[in-house]
Amino acid sequence: MTHALLHLKGRVSPDLEAQWMQQLEAVGQAHHWSELQVHQLQLVVEEWMENLLAHALAPNAGLQAILQLQDVDDELELTLSDSGQAFNPLTRPPPSLDLDLDQLQPGGWGLHFIRSLACGTHYERREDHNHLTLRFKK
């Protein structure tokens, strides 16, 4: 059974990110989730927003973001959508973890982190928006 928990929209900005962090915490408290569950969702949303701010947002572009959180049986399903250029983060190869620290290259670590927290991922480009869906065990 699916139960909608959050549906948030806004123009990408640091202020929007802070508002969404508070909303996630409030929903987590209302549903008695563990601090770890809430923190994981917040980290994922924070990383996604930071990537939008750093890579997808041209000055005054008005990039829109949408967060949907649903309770689906034994999982939480988080869908993050944006009106930026098409970008499938799931096709980017993970960074090499076999290198020494001084050999590691920048880039891709946030996406790797997001994928490592989720138990399932899906991406699609629909209606001029990127839609990244992540599933987490409750």
Give residue spans per PLM region.
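Bergerat-fold GHKL ATPase/HATPase_c domain
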Residues: 1-43
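A conserved short beta-strand within the histidine kinase catalytic ATPase domain
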Residues: 61-70
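Conserved ATP-binding N-box helix of the HATPase_c
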Residues: 36-60
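Flexible, glycine-/charge-rich segments associated with ATP-binding catalytic modules
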Residues: 1-15, 115-138
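Short beta-strand-loop-beta element adjacent to the nucleotide/active-site pocket used for signaling
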Residues: 70-78
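Glycine-rich/acidic phosphate-handling loop/turn and adjacent ATP-lid/helix
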Residues: 78-106
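Glycine-rich phosphate-binding loop
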Residues: 103-118
